[in-house]
Amino acid sequence: GVTYVNINGEIIKTLLPDMSNISIKEINILDIDNRQFLQSIDKDLQQCIKDEKYKQLIKTVDSDEKVCILKKEKSSDCPSAFLITVQSKEDTQLIWITGDMRKEDLEKLLKKL
């Protein structure tokens, strides 16, 4: 199946008060454990990453898991965006974080999620 979760910035501030120095507009999480569905959207996802000019920050490959963190630079009308993909044998998670933060802030946030 597919599970979608949206967390707005106000809830994040309430849940993580020690992260008040960063400005997160929202976090969107898509959890996919349907291989057919994932294969059908993979090409579209790769094209979106290319079109939106995401840059890879980190990529790790473990024996059973791949993690990739990409960043889209902010423009005058849009804040920064991060896309985190976590792929394992069982499922894949796509996590979009929209807001202004440094790499160190992102690492701190990910440890809390």
For every predicted segment, state its role.
Residues 102-112:
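Short, low-complexity, Pro/Ser/Thr/Gly-rich segments in the mature regions of secreted, periplasmic
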Residues 70-103:
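A short, solvent-exposed beta-edge/loop patch
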Residues 3-6, 40, 68, 82, ...:
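Terminal interaction module
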Residues 1-44:
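Early exported N-terminus immediately downstream of N-terminal targeting peptides
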Residues 2, 22-24, 62-64, 78-79:
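Extracytoplasmic
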Residues 46-74:
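Short Gly/Thr-rich strand-loop-strand
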Residues 37-51, 95-98, 106-107:
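Surface-exposed flexible segments
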